[in-house]
């Protein structure tokens, strides 16, 4: 792997993690029939951030933010890394 391909591969992996987390968070919201206001309170963010999440705007979120939001809402997280 060259230095030129490393950032692209990292961005792809990061994107996949963010998209996966956001899908789970949207499911959490849907399963509980939460309004944007309810979800914002549960995740500890503004309603506009919830609308961005529900719209799948993954480029607006970093993994750390999504982890913190999920934790505030009481979601259980697991990380699996394999080779």
List the predicted regions and their residue ranges:
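DNA major-groove recognition helix of helix-turn-helix
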Residues: 54
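DNA major-groove recognition helix of helix-turn-helix/homeodomain DNA-binding modules
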Residues: 63-79
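Short, charged recognition helix plus adjacent turn
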Residues: 81-83
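Short alpha-helical DNA-recognition segment
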Residues: 33-51
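N-terminal flexible/basic segments that precede or flank functional cores
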Residues: 1-24
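The alpha-helix within a helix-turn-helix
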Residues: 29, 40, 70
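Hydrophobic alpha-helical segments typical of transmembrane helices
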Residues: 21-24, 49, 65
């Amino acid at each position: 792997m060259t230095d030129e391909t490393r950032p692209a591969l990292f961005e792809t992996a990061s994107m996949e993690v963010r998209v996966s987390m956001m899908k789970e968070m949207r499911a959490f919201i849907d399963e509980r029939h939460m309004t944007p206001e309810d979800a914002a309170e549960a995740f500890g963010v503004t309603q506009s951030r919830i609308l961005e999440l529900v719209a799948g705007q993954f480029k607006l979120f970093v993994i750390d933010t999504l982890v913190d939001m999920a934790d505030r809402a009481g979601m259980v997280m697991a990380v699996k890394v394999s080779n």
